[in-house]
Amino acid sequence: MAKKKADRRRAPAAESQDKHPPVRLKIRRQDAPDKPETRRWETFEVEYLPRMNVISALQQIQKHPVTVAGVEVAPVVWDCSCLEEVCGACSMLINGRVRQACSALVDVISPKGKPIVLEPLRKFPLVRDLMVDRSRLFESLKRIRAWIEIDGTHPQGPGPRQSQEQQEELYPLSRCMSCGCCLEACPQYGPHSDFVGAAVISQVRLFNAHPTGALQKSERLEAIMGPGGIADCGKAQNCVEVCPLGIPLVDSIQTVAGETSRRFILSWLLGWSSDGG
């Protein structure tokens, strides 16, 4: 008798799950960057699963790439790796907003079975379908020397210690995953501009604040004062609104802007060269 009551208690939940409509995805596709004539929209339906995200839906399409019209097509191409909002690879436009596909839950972005619209990022060169090439971002990080130089021919011993306050201030900056969301939302960034963007500026702040990284502070400031650097920021503050990790990008821009202003004034007063001081 007790078992029958338990079965009756579970029945409504199972019934409500069965009634959940399939998840419909409308995807912007293109076969190759040099084939704009292949640009098109294709719509798919996949089975709803509890707590599924957009990546889960794309994986279902990959296994069974058939549109709602019953046409079998090539599997949709997208980029991903960690599936836990760490690698930054799965950035795309979801319902018109740039975000990470791995953290976009269907229950949140598709209430009552509303179609989910997926598009590739527009500020980066297209590879295929939802996959883009973020090489420009990585080249910008090289330009500002976004690393700590510790290599050498002999052991250099332990590095300098940081206070707890320094660690708490810098840790949020270190979480940047180079996903490109801030660059996609920035009106100053794109093919029309050389602007490096908020993510790169924030890394200047991070590495200049590190006791060992500060040894290359002058080089980083000179790089970010050059073409496409801090002066090209339009102060729109879209970057901080879309950052999936809540990194204080506007604070970083303000900090680096102050440092570059001081360096410019000192170089003018003291006659420093671009590689000195």
Label the predicted regions.
Residues 2-16:
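Short, Gly/Pro- and small/polar-rich lid/capping loops
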Residues 19-25:
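Short structural boundary motif marking the start of a folded domain
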Residues 24, 41, 64-66:
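Beta-strand-dominated extracellular/periplasmic modules and repeats
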Residues 27-33:
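Short polar catalytic/cofactor-binding loops
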Residues 39-53:
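Short, contiguous acidic and Ser/Thr-rich linear segments
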Residues 52-74, 105-106, 114-277:
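Ferredoxin-type iron-sulfur electron-transfer modules in oxidoreductases and energy-metabolism complexes
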